[in-house]
Amino acid sequence: KSKDWKVKPELLHGDGFQDAIVLIFGKPRTAIFAHMDNIGYAVSYKKNLVRIGGPRGESGWKLVGSDSKGEIECTLKVQWLWAAGNKKEELKYRFKRNIDRGTPLIFKPNFRETEKTVQTPYLDNRLGVWNALQVAENLENGIIVFSTYEEVGGGSVQFLAKYMSSLHIAQFG
């Protein structure tokens, strides 16, 4: 809960920030980066899916997302086809309607918690964000960056690091 944070940060986001979020606390001397994107699939033509990142999935696994028509919870369908003696993987989705092309679909979270462990697919991204938010509670002088596009497009970290460098020199140097 941000209302319990020791210092209220300046929030940078929106146009020009490549869907990233930057929190600036006090006079920054350090930075934490956590990426927010997930691996999964993008919807293509004829219910086909294209990989985003390096997901491994099996038929029957649940995928979630949203498009212009609403929320989506669909099922992954993995088929192996033989063409000219070569085995080829075909990825499709099962859903009651067509999903807008380009819509990202990620694995439905499946958190399993015991007294000693938490398990869910692709936990690294989620833990990075959670850890950064825990640090935010007591951070007085630093920057927390929630970056994007690490799974596709080369990521936003290089752009954000350059921006932070110019910001640091301009405001805090």
Predicted regions and their residues:
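N-terminal hydrophobic/helix-forming segments and targeting peptides
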Residues: 1-173
